[in-house]
Amino acid sequence: MIPKIYKKIKWLQSNPLILKKILRGIEREALRTDIHGTIINTAYPQDKIGSALTHKWITTDFSESLLEFITPTNASTNYILKFLNDTHKFVNDNLIQEYFWPFSIPPCKKYMHSIKLSKYGTSNLGQVKTLYRKGLKHRYGILMNIISGVHYNFSLPRIFWNHWKKIHHKNTQYNTTSEGYLCLIRNYYKFGWIIPYLFGASPAVEPLFIKNKKHNYKFKKHHGMLYLPWSTSLRLSDLGHTNQSIKKLKLTFNSLSEYVLALEHGIKTPSKQFKNLGLYDQFGNFKQINTNLLQTENELYTYIRPKQKLKNCESLSAALRNRGIEYVEIRALDINPFTSTGVDKNQILLLDLFLIWCVLADSPKISSQEFHFFLKNWHTIITKGRKPKQKININIYNTKNTIQTIGKTILYDLFYIAEILDSLSNNNNYQETCKNLILYFDYPELTYSEKLLNKFMCYGIYETGANLFVKYKQKLHNDSFKILSKKDLNNEMMKSNNSQKLIEKQDTLNFKEYLNLYYTK
């Protein structure tokens, strides 16, 4: 059943200011391609952008071809979107012959074997980041690792948690913030499938993308692509950005200590599969950081992550254990192909509303069996979410209801939260977002996945992609800087390059010593 939040809404209506300073941040990945939609395999242009190791706002993900744009956190949605646009414009204007691939699923037609792993210089820190990516390549292959997405970082203000504690937990030793975020995460797994339903934008792939992958999907063929007629986000499926560690670690998100222990178990538990890959190659060079279930905590691919800022050389598990959960990272957003920066304001506003709802709605602790039961609902949405009258389970007793009924029920709840947030800014932005998106459940042709699939059916993946990335290149070029200036970005480029050199000079350990000290405990 969908939890009732009426009493919590009344409480929020009496205390609206506790939502005043929500902090948000965005991370957007984008592949560099040429005019033909072929991935560019040249080295990351450090001389034009800055150091991928130390730049505050622009870096690389898995490969030299896969850019990552990072905004600082801010309480203003407009600020982070303008900031994101500024960094896109800077790179766009500096890489004259290059384009940002506008989809999550990478173009696969050429040169997959020659994709270059990201390089971060000669420091131990830089080398271990490259080694981690080498391990990912051996474990999961190149294609999975160059899938692009958008991550949304979200945290509620401290004053919210202070008020929340007064009505929930009298025990001063109780970590209200961490427990509140864990409640959010459990509800996110129960109901967060609305995100790929509304915003999923990877309904089709190229045949090469699934080559040598075992699956039971009955793909249809058209225009050189494979697609599922009702799918929303193949990126989130078992063909995309996933691994099997989540099943072996028995995650439930019932307590912080339980989650930290699961992370540490993944880091320390040997994997027969990864041991068979070997730790070293024939020349004695490392192939991966270790042969355990996880090389680092970042390898645990989930739809949402509890996060805490890291101190120098600190692991995520240590940071969470020592200081609790500071924010959550939403990882279920595909690249939005209908905007030049991969994400738009409506998506941010919907996520704000839904994540607040996930905190307000009661979320009892769950078993590992229940957790995987919820994942099955995600799988249904991901692979056939737009199918007419499609039903999903609403509890483990096989009670079902339609996606439309459940989705609209949640959106009606979000209207109440929208009214409160809009009252803080004297506009109707959140309410308008709800009014627009609730229609998607009755009219799935409005969803991103169906709109994109219709374009693919007419023009194919490459022509659709080219039409979009050429348009966005011109749009970004014509845009003016709003938050950052060109001078700011040039200064950060030079500063980051100098910072990388300084880190390289300060190393005192050789690489094996460094690896043993920080990664083989």
Curated annotation (Swiss-Prot):
Q: Name one Pfam family in it.
A: Glu_cys_ligase
The cross-references to InterPro entries, in alphabetical order and at most eight, read: Gln_synth/guanido_kin_cat_dom, Glu_cys_ligase, Glut_cys_ligase
Instruction: Give me any GO biological process, just one.
Output: glutathione biosynthetic process
Alphabetical keyword list = ATP-binding, Glutathione biosynthesis, Ligase, Nucleotide-binding
Reaction(s) catalysed by this chain, per the record, are: L-cysteine + L-glutamate + ATP = gamma-L-glutamyl-L-cysteine + ADP + phosphate + H(+)
Q: Tell me the PANTHER family matching this sequence.
A: GLUTAMATE--CYSTEINE LIGASE
Report the protein name in the record.
Glutamate--cysteine ligase
Record organism: Buchnera aphidicola subsp. Baizongia pistaciae (strain Bp)
Q: Which taxonomic lineage is given here?
A: Bacteria, Pseudomonadati, Pseudomonadota, Gammaproteobacteria, Enterobacterales
